[in-house]
C-alpha cells in the first residue's frame, strides 16, 4: 500500500523533462500562468458571468474516447506545475518564453562557446573524444589533412539533419537545471534517467559510462606540448581574460557546486544512518506525512534523485522508473526513433531549504573528517592531462568545498590567444557525438546545468559548461551523427534559440525554439548551390530583434527595420527649452559635472597619445598659416605668434570647461574675410583697427551670453541631417581644395623649366644683373642702405641677395620670379601624395592579416603620426630643399606698436563703441552657426556618446574666450568641423574580443578632455620647439589636410546618393531608404541638396564669404519647404524629422493611442477569445466593444447572439 501511494505521487510520463524547481518546488498552489502573463503586460479582461443553467452551452455527447482525449490534452499542457497557454505558432511561444523574467540569475543568457567532440580511435588503439569543430559566432572546423583550424565560415546545415535533431529532442532525454559538479556525476545522472525511461539497457550502462568519460583531446594540445608549463590559479587568468565574477554571476557557481557535492556525500551515507530511502522520499514528496511531526523530529536527510544522486543509489532510480503509461503522439520516423512509447520520466528535485537544513547538522560532524579526492572543478576521468591533480587530495569538504585558489589549470595546454576572443562571462556548450559497437539504437541527452560548472579538460578553454548534448549510436552512421551535432551547435549560436535554451522550462519549449528556427531558415536548391563551399562571414550581421516582436492578432508584424523613424531629431534633454534664465546652462553643468573626473581617468590609453600627436601636427599648420594670412591682411597687427597664443589659450580653456571637449577649435575662412573687410574699413576711415575689433569682439561675446541665457541653442533641433551634411561636405571639400591649391602654389615658388633641351644643358645659366629702369622705391632703398648700382658686384650675388637689392635675373635657366629650381616641386608632389596614401593605408592596417591584433591596432592608432615621422626622415635623408614649417622663435607681439592688452576705445571716437554692435550681430550669427553645427555633427547618435552634450556650455565658453581674445588682440577661434570629426574618428573604441570571423563592434568614442587639452598645451609650447618643428616639410602637412578632408567624407550620405546617378538599378547597394522611397524622389532630394552645396561653395570662395553663416541658416528654411514635396515617411528615411508644434504633437499622440488600442483588440475573425478552466471558450465580438482612450476603461458588452441578450462587464487593463 505504501508503494502504491508513492507511485501515485511520482510524476508520470506526460509531465515534461527533468526540471529543478529550486525553492518553488514546495509551492503547490502557485498560479504560474498568471505570474508569467503579468510580466508580459498582457491585456486582461475580467468577465462576470451569472451562474445559471441557461447560460451554459450544451454539447453533443461524443463518446468516452473523445473526453479521454480532451483530458489527456489538458494534462499534457500542464508543464512543471504550471498551465501553459495555448499558442498558434512556435514563434508566439518563443516570444512568450523570451518575455519571461526569472528572478534567479541561472536563467540569464550568457555568451556561449560551443565545442563539438567526436568519439574516435587514437592511433588505432583506444577511443578518445577528439575536438572536430567549434563555434563562437561562426563555425571553425579542424581540417582533415592540415592539422589546423579552418577559416571561420557561416554554417550551412541540411534540412534533414535539423528534422533529425528535432526528433532527438522529442524522443531523447532532456534534463534541465541539473546540479552536478563533475563529469562523473553528470554521466551517472543521465544514465540513471535513460535506464529509468527505458532508453538504455542497464546491462550496457558501464560501457556507455566508460565511453562518456574517455579522455578529451583538443586541437591546440599539439601546439603547446613543448611549451614550459605555466601553472597559475584560475582566479589570476580571470582577471585578464575573463570576467572576474564569472562563476559568482552564474548563480554562485562554486558554492552551488559545493552544495551539490555535499548533497551527494550525504546521500551516499544513507545506509550509515539507517534511514530508509523510501521513507525519505515520501517525506519530501508527501507534505501531509510531516504535518503532525514536531520540528525537532523532522527528517533531516536529503533525498537522492536521478539528478543529484551518485551511482550508489540504484534503488531510487528503479523507483522513479515506475510510472503510468500513456500513448504519445508518434514523431516522424527519422534517424532517431523513440525508445519506447513513453517520454522519459520527470523527477522533481527536493526543496533547497530542506537540503540545507539536512546538511546543517551533518557539516558540523564531518567538517574535519571528509576528504574529497576528485575535487570540485576537476575530474580525473574527464581530463587526466589537463589538470594539476597534485593538490586534489588537499581540497576539503569543509563547507567551502573547492576554491579557485586550490583549483589549478595547466595553462600550458590552453590557447590563450583564442581565450582572449571569448567574451567576459561566457559559458560553454559541449556537443558529444560518436558511434560505438555495443549500441543497437541511438541514445540522446540534452542537459542544462544550474549553475554552470568548470569541467576542466572537457573544453579547450577554461570556461564553465552550461549545456551538454550527447548522441551515441550504432556504427555506420557517423556522418549523420556529425551533421546532427553541427545542427545543435549552430542552433546554440543562433541568438533566439540561445535565449530559449537558457529560459526553457520543458521539452516543448526547446521544440518550439527549433520550430521557430525552421520557420526562419532558407533552403537552397541542391542543383544551384554546392554545400561544400564555405560562405565568408558577413561584414555586418542582421539584427534578430524582429523575431522577438509578437505578431498582432490581425496578422501584421511590426518589423524594426520597416517602420519609419518617428523619434524627433535631437530629442534629447540637452535641447529642451527650460523657460528659465540660464536654465539650459545650469542643466548642462549638472549633466557634465559628474563626469569631470572621469574625463581625465578615461584618457589613460595609448589611443589618446596617438590622437594627441596626430591632431597636434594637424592643427599646427592651419593655425600658423591662418596667422600668416592674417598678418598679410592686417600689415602685421595680428600674425603667427598671436595666432599660436590665441589658439593655445582658447583651446585650453575650452577643453577644461566646455560641455563637449571632443570639439576642436580652429580658425575659419569667414572670420578671415571679416578681418580683411574690417581692416580695410578702418584704414579708409583712419580708425584704430585693434580698438574697433576689440569693441566688436566684446559686443559679440555679450550677445553670445544672451543667447545662452535665453536657451537659444534649443533652436539647433531644426538643424537636420540635410543641413549637417551640406555644411560638413562643404568644409571637407574646402580642406581638399585648399590642400591641392597650396600644392599648386608651390609651382610658382619653385618653378621648373618645361622646355629643356637636353643637348644644351651645359649652356644654361641664370645670373643676377642690375635693373635697367630702377623704380623710385628701389632707388629709395639703395639710398637708405647707402649704396649705388655701380658699387654692387651683381654677378656674384646669391639669389636671396639679388632679390633683396631688387636685381633682375637673366639667362636661359631663369623663370618669371627667379632661376628655375630643379626637383623641389616634384619632390613636394611625391611627399604630398605619399603622405596621403600612407596615412590611409596605415589607418586601415587594423583590418589586414599581418602581425598580431595588438600590433595592428597600435599601428592604426598612430597612423598619421607614423606617416609624418617616416616622411620627415625620408625628406631629411634625400636632402632635396623642400619648404619647411616656420614657427616664430620669440614670444612677443609681431607689431612693435602694440601690446598684449588692447583698449576697446583707443584713439577712436566714442560712438564707435555703439556702432560696433551692428557688425557684432553678424559676427554672432557666424560664431553661433559654425559652433552649433559642428557640435550637432559631433553629438550624432551614431557616435554613441554616453556623457551627454552641452550646447549651452559650449557656446558660453566660446563667447567668453572670444571676449578675452578681443581684449588681448588675438584671433577669434570657433569649432573647426573637419578637425573635430578627425578628433572623434581617432578616438573610436571597438570591441576587443570579437569572435573569429566577426567584425569588431563599434562601442563608442573615448570621451575625455585630455587629448584636446594636451593638443593646445603643445601648441602653446611650439615656440620653444622650433629646433624640431623646422624639419617638417609643408607638403607633408598638406597631405595630412587631404587625408582629413577625404576621411571626413566617409559616412556622409549625400555622396552615397550621388553615386546612385551612375548606377543601374540592379547594381545599386541595398540601402535602407531605397526600399521605401522611389528612386526618382531620392534623386530629387540629392539634386536639391547638391544645389545648396554649390551655392554655399560659391559664396564661401567669393568676396561675400562674410554672409556665409546666413546662407547656412537659409538651409533650414529650404529643408522646411521640402515638406511640401515629400511625405513625412519619405523624409524620415532620407533625413531627420523636424520638430512640430506642441498641438500637433498632442493630436498625433492621441491618434496613435487610438490606433494601438484598436489594433490590440482586433483579431483575425474580429473576436476576443476568453478560455476558462473547464475547457469552455467565451467569444466576444469586437464590434460590441466600445473603447475610448480618454474615458475609464470599463465598458458594457452586449451579446446579441444570446437568447436573453445578457450584458457582461468587461474591465480592460491596457
Swiss-Prot record:
Give me the stretches of Pro residues compositional bias. Answer: 303-313
Per UniProt, the ranges with Polar residues bias are 379-392
Q: Can you list the GO cellular component terms from the UniProt entry?
A: apical plasma membrane; basolateral plasma membrane; membrane; plasma membrane; stereocilium
What are this entry's molecular-function GO terms?
monoatomic anion transmembrane transporter activity; sodium:bicarbonate symporter activity; solute:inorganic anion antiporter activity
Please name the InterPro entries in this protein's record: Band3_cytoplasmic_dom (IPR013769), HCO3_transpt-like_TM_dom (IPR011531), HCO3_transpt_euk (IPR003020), PTrfase/Anion_transptr (IPR016152)
For the region Disordered, give the residue spans: 1-22, 52-93, 289-346, 362-408, 552-572, 1144-1169
Q: Where in the cell is it found?
A: Basolateral cell membrane; Apical cell membrane; Cell projection, Stereocilium; Cell membrane
Which organism's genome codes for this protein?
A: Homo sapiens (Human)
Q: Where does the record place Basic residues bias?
A: 55-72
Keyword Magnesium part of the UniProt annotation? no
Q: Which PANTHER family match?
A: ANION EXCHANGE PROTEIN, SODIUM BICARBONATE COTRANSPORTER 3
Please state how the activity of this protein is regulated: Transporter activity is regulated by CA2/carbonic anhydrase 2, cAMP and PKA. Insensitive to stilbene derivatives. Inhibited by 5-(N-ethyl-N-isopropyl)-amiloride (EIPA).
The record's annotation in NCBIfam families points to: ae
Modification Phosphoserine, positions: 52, 55, 84, 150, 233, 242, 382, 400, 403, 407, 556, 1176, 1213
What functional role does this protein have?
Answer: Electroneutral sodium- and bicarbonate-dependent cotransporter with a Na(+):HCO3(-) 1:1 stoichiometry. Mediates the sodium-dependent bicarbonate transport important for pH recovery after acid load as well as for regulation of steady-state pH in the duodenum and vascular smooth muscle cells. Plays a key role in macrophage acidification, mediating bicarbonate import into the cytoplasm which is crucial for net acid extrusion and maintenance of cytoplasmic pH during phagocytosis.
Protein name stated in the entry: Sodium bicarbonate cotransporter 3
Residue spans of biased composition, Basic and acidic residues class: 1-12, 73-85, 563-572, 1144-1162
Positions bearing carbohydrate: 171, 269, 398, 406, 776, 786, 791
Amino acid at each position: 500500500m505504501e508503494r502504491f501511494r508513492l507511485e501515485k505521487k511520482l510524476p508520470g510520463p506526460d509531465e515534461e523533462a527533468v526540471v529543478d524547481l529550486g525553492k518553488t518546488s514546495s509551492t503547490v498552489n502557485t498560479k504560474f500562468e498568471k505570474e508569467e502573463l503579468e510580466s508580459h503586460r498582457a491585456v486582461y479582461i475580467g468577465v462576470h458571468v451569472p451562474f445559471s443553467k441557461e447560460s451554459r452551452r450544451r454539447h453533443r455527447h461524443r463518446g468516452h474516447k473523445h473526453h479521454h482525449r480532451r483530458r489527456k490534452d489538458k494534462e499534457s499542457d500542464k508543464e512543471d506545475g504550471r498551465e501553459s497557454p495555448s499558442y498558434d505558432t512556435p514563434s508566439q511561444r518563443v516570444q512568450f518564453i523570451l518575455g519571461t523574467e526569472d528572478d534567479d540569475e541561472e536563467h540569464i543568457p550568457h555568451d556561449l562557446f560551443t565545442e563539438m567532440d567526436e568519439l574516435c580511435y587514437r592511433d588505432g588503439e583506444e577511443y578518445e573524444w577528439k575536438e572536430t569543430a567549434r563555434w563562437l559566432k561562426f563555425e571553425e572546423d579542424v581540417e582533415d589533412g592540415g592539422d589546423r583550424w579552418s577559416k571561420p565560415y557561416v554554417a550551412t546545415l541540411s534540412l534533414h539533419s535539423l528534422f533529425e535533431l528535432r526528433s532527438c529532442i522529442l524522443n531523447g532525454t532532456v534534463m534541465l537545471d541539473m546540479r552536478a559538479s563533475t563529469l562523473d556525476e553528470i554521466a551517472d545522472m543521465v544514465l540513471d534517467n535513460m535506464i529509468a525511461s527505458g532508453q538504455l539497457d542497464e546491462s550496457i550502462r558501464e560501457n556507455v559510462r566508460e565511453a562518456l568519460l574517455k579522455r578529451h583531446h583538443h586541437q591546440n594540445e599539439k601546439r603547446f606540448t613543448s611549451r614550459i608549463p605555466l601553472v597559475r590559479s584560475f582566479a589570476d587568468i580571470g582577471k585578464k581574460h575573463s570576467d572576474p565574477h564569472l562563476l559568482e554571476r552564474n548563480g554562485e557557481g562554486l558554492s552551488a557546486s559545493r552544495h551539490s557535492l555535499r548533497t551527494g556525500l550525504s546521500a551516499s551515507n544513507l545506509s550509515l544512518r539507517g534511514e530508509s530511502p523510501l521513507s525519505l522520499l515520501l517525506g519530501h514528496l508527501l507534505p501531509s506525512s510531516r504535518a503532525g511531526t514536531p520540528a525537532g523530529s523532522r527528517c533531516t536527510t536529503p533525498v537522492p534523485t536521478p539528478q543529484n544522486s551518485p551511482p550508489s543509489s540504484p534503488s531510487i532510480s528503479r523507483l522513479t522508473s515506475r510510472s503510468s503509461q500513456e500513448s504519445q503522439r508518434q514523431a516522424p520516423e527519422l534517424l532517431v526513433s523513440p525508445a519506447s512509447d513513453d517520454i522519459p520520466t520527470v523527477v522533481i528535485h527536493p526543496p533547497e531549504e530542506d537540503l540545507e537544513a539536512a546538511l546543517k547538522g551533518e557539516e558540523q560532524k564531518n567538517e574535519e573528517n571528509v576528504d574529497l579526492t576528485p575535487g570540485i572543478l576537476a575530474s580525473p576521468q574527464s581530463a587526466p592531462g589537463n589538470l594539476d591533480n597534485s593538490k586534489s587530495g588537499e581540497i576539503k569538504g569543509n563547507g567551502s568545498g573547492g576554491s579557485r585558489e586550490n583549483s589549478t589549470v595547466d595553462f600550458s595546454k590552453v590557447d590563450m590567444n583564442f581565450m582572449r576572443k571569448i567574451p567576459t562571462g561566457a559559458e560553454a556548450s559541449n556537443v558529444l557525438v560518436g558511434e560505438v559497437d555495443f549500441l543497437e539504437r541511438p541514445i540522446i541527452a540534452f542537459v542544462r546545468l544550474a549553475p554552470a560548472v568548470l569541467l576542466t579538460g572537457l573544453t579547450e578553454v577554461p570556461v564553465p559548461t552550461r549545456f551538454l548534448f550527447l548522441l551515441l549510436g550504432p556504427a555506420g552512421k557517423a556522418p549523420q551523427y556529425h551533421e546532427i551535432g553541427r545542427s545543435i551547435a549552430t542552433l546554440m549560436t543562433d541568438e533566439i534559440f540561445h535565449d530559449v535554451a537558457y529560459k526553457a522550462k520543458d521539452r516543448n519549449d526547446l521544440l518550439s525554439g527549433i520550430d521557430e528556427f525552421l520557420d526562419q531558415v532558407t533552403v537552397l536548391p541542391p542543383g544551384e548551390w554546392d554545400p561544400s563551399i564555405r560562405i565568408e562571414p558577413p561584414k555586418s550581421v542582421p539584427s534578430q530583434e524582429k523575431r522577438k516582436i509578437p505578431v498582432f492578432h490581425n496578422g501584421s508584424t511590426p518589423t524594426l527595420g520597416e517602420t519609419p523613424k518617428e523619434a524627433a531629431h535631437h530629442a534629447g534633454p540637452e535641447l529642451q527649452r527650460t523657460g528659465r534664465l540660464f536654465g539650459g546652462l545650469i542643466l548642462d553643468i549638472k549633466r557634465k559635472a559628474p563626469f569631470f573626473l572621469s574625463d581625465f581617468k578615461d584618457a589613460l590609453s595609448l589611443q589618446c597619445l596617438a590622437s594627441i600627436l596626430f591632431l597636434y601636427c594637424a592643427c599646427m599648420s592651419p593655425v600658423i598659416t591662418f596667422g600668416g594670412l592674417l598678418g598679410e591682411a592686417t600689415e602685421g597687427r595680428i600674425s603667427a605668434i598671436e595666432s599660436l597664443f590665441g589658439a593655445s589659450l582658447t583651446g585650453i580653456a575650452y577643453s577644461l570647461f566646455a560641455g563637449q571637449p571632443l570639439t576642436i577649435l580652429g580658425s575659419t575662412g569667414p572670420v578671415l574675410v571679416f578681418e580683411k573687410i574690417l581692416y580695410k574699413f578702418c584704414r579708409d576711415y583712419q580708425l584704430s583697427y585693434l580698438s574697433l575689433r576689440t569693441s566688436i569682439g566684446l559686443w559679440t561675446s555679450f550677445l553670445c551670453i544672451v543667447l545662452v541665457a535665453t536657451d537659444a541653442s534649443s533652436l539647433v533641433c531644426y538643424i537636420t541631417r540635410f543641413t549637417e551634411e551640406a555644411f560638413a561636405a562643404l568644409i571637407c571639400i574646402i580642406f581638399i581644395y585648399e590642400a591641392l591649391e597650396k600644392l599648386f602654389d608651390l609651382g610658382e615658388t619653385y618653378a621648373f623649366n618645361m622646355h629643356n633641351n637636353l643637348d644644351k644643358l651645359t649652356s644654361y645659366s641664370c645670373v643676377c644683373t642690375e635693373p635697367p629702369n630702377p623704380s623710385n622705391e628701389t632707388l629709395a632703398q639703395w639710398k637708405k642702405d647707402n649704396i649705388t648700382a655701380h658699387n654692387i658686384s651683381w654677378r656674384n650675388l646669391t639669389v636671396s641677395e639679388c632679390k633683396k637689392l631688387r636685381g633682375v635675373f637673366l639667362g636661359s635657366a631663369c623663370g618669371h620670379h627667379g632661376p628655375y629650381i630643379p626637383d623641389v616641386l616634384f619632390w613636394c608632389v611625391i611627399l604630398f601624395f605619399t603622405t596621403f596614401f600612407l596615412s590611409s593605408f596605415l589607418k586601415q592596417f587594423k583590418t589586414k592579416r599581418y602581425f598580431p591584433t595588438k600590433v595592428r591596432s597600435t599601428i592604426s592608432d598612430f597612423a598619421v603620426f607614423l606617416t609624418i615621422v617616416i616622411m620627415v626622415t625620408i625628406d631629411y635623408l634625400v636632402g632635396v630643399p623642400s619648404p619647411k614649417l616656420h614657427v616664430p622663435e620669440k614670444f612677443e607681439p609681431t607689431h612693435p606698436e602694440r601690446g598684449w592688452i588692447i583698449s576697446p576705445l583707443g584713439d577712436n571716437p566714442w560712438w564707435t563703441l555703439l556702432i560696433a554692435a551692428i557688425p557684432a550681430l553678424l559676427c554672432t550669427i557666424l560664431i553661433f552657426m559654425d559652433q552649433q553645427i559642428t557640435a550637432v555633427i559631433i553629438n550624432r547618435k551614431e557616435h554613441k556618446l554616453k556623457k551627454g552634450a552641452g550646447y549651452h556650455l559650449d557656446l558660453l565658453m566660446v563667447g567668453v574666450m572670444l571676449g578675452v581674445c578681443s581684449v588681448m588682440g588675438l584671433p577669434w577661434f570657433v569649432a573647426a568641423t573637419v578637425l573635430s570629426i578627425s578628433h572623434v574618428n581617432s578616438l573610436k573604441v571597438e570591441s576587443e574580443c570579437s569572435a573569429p570571423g566577426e567584425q569588431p563592434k563599434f562601442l563608442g568614442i573615448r570621451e575625455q578632455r585630455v587629448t584636446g587639452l594636451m593638443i593646445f598645451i603643445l601648441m602653446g609650447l611650439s615656440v620653444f620647439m622650433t629646433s624640431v618643428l623646422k624639419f617638417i616639410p609643408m607638403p607633408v602637412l598638406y597631405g595630412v589636410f587631404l587625408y582629413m578632408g577625404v576621411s571626413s567624407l566617409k559616412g556622409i550620405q549625400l555622396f552615397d546618393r550621388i553615386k546612385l546617378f551612375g548606377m543601374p538599378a540592379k547594381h545599386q547597394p541595398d540601402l535602407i531608404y531605397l526600399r521605401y522611397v522611389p528612386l526618382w524622389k531620392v534623386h530629387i532630394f540629392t539634386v536639391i541638396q547638391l544645389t545648396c552645396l554649390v551655392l554655399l561653395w560659391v559664396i564661401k570662395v567669393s568676396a561675400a564669404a562674410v554672409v556665409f553663416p546666413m546662407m547656412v541658416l537659409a538651409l533650414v528654411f529650404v529643408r522646411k519647404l521640402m515638406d511640401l514635396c515629400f511625405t513625412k515617411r519619405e523624409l524620415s528615411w532620407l533625413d531627420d524629422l523636424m520638430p512640430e508644434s506642441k498641438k500637433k504633437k498632442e493630436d498625433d499622440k492621441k491618434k496613435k493611442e487610438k490606433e494601438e488600442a484598436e489594433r490590440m483588440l482586433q483579431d483575425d475573425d474580429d473576436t476576443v477569445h476568453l478560455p476558462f478552466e473547464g475547457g469552455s471558450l467565451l467569444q466576444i465580438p469586437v464590434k460590441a466593444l466600445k473603447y475610448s482612450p480618454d474615458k475609464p476603461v470599463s465598458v458594457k458588452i452586449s451579446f446579441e447572439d444570446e437568447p436573453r441578450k445578457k450584458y457582461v462587464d468587461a474591465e480592460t487593463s491596457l
